[in-house]
Amino acid sequence: MSRYTGPSWKRSRRLGISLSGTGKELARRNYAPGQHGPNSRGRLSEYGQQLHEKQKLRWMYGLNERQFRTLFIRAGKIREGQHGINFMILLERRLDSIVYRLGLATTREQARQLVNHGHITVDGKRVDIPSYEVSVGQTIGLKDKSKNLQQIRDALEATTARPSFVSFDENKMEGTLVRLPERDEMEPEIDESLVVEWYNKLL
């Protein structure tokens, strides 16, 4: 399944949340796009709620359906913890997500582009795979030439706080995943139990 390349604001308005995390998509029109947008969010069925939550989480992290489902299945094989929370932890451990959490990018989409274009290093070695799974203790940095990119400097300047599961050295412009995230440190708008219910019916 190909990745959606249309305007992200349309998806954000349809779901009623900011998928980029900036809030800009909903600043002017906090309702779904289209002629009936202001009145289009009625009460969803149980099926609709589960699908809505699954799509919201998938689009938030920018994965296609195959990638998303594969990661969900992997999370189910982890013996300790809850399936839904383990799934979200795996999403957070993606390299593009850690780059975003460190403040090197203002959105996950921008973080994914930085990884794809070869600007990001893991333990000093260039990694250009956004889905690369970061382990606790690994250091995420920038190639020397990339440290002067204006978009990265702008992102760092705009970053006012970082979650406690990462640390960042402003001078070296690199950060570390110091531990796995807790549930309250991940996306609060998501009800992961609905995502689990959705896939349990399909798998």
Curated annotation (Swiss-Prot):
Subunit field text: Part of the 30S ribosomal subunit. Contacts protein S5. The interaction surface between S4 and S5 is involved in control of translational fidelity.
Entries under PROSITE patterns matching the protein: RIBOSOMAL_S4, S4
Record keyword rRNA-binding present: yes
GO terms (BP aspect): ribosomal small subunit biogenesis; translation
Annotated keywords: Ribonucleoprotein, Ribosomal protein, RNA-binding, rRNA-binding
Protein function: One of the primary rRNA binding proteins, it binds directly to 16S rRNA where it nucleates assembly of the body of the 30S subunit. With S5 and S12 plays an important role in translational accuracy.
NCBIfam families hit by this protein: PRK05327.1 (NF003717), rpsD_bact (TIGR01017)
Family from the record: Belongs to the universal ribosomal protein uS4 family.
SMART domains associated with the record: Ribosomal_S4 (SM01390), S4 (SM00363)
Organism: Lactobacillus acidophilus (strain ATCC 700396 / NCK56 / N2 / NCFM)
InterPro entries tied to this protein: Ribosomal_uS4, Ribosomal_uS4_bac-type, Ribosomal_uS4_CS, Ribosomal_uS4_N, S4_RNA-bd, S4_RNA-bd_sf
This protein's name: Small ribosomal subunit protein uS4
Domain S4 RNA-binding: 93-155
PANTHER family membership: 30S 40S RIBOSOMAL PROTEIN, SMALL RIBOSOMAL SUBUNIT PROTEIN US4M
GO MF entry, a single one: rRNA binding
A single cellular component GO annotation: small ribosomal subunit
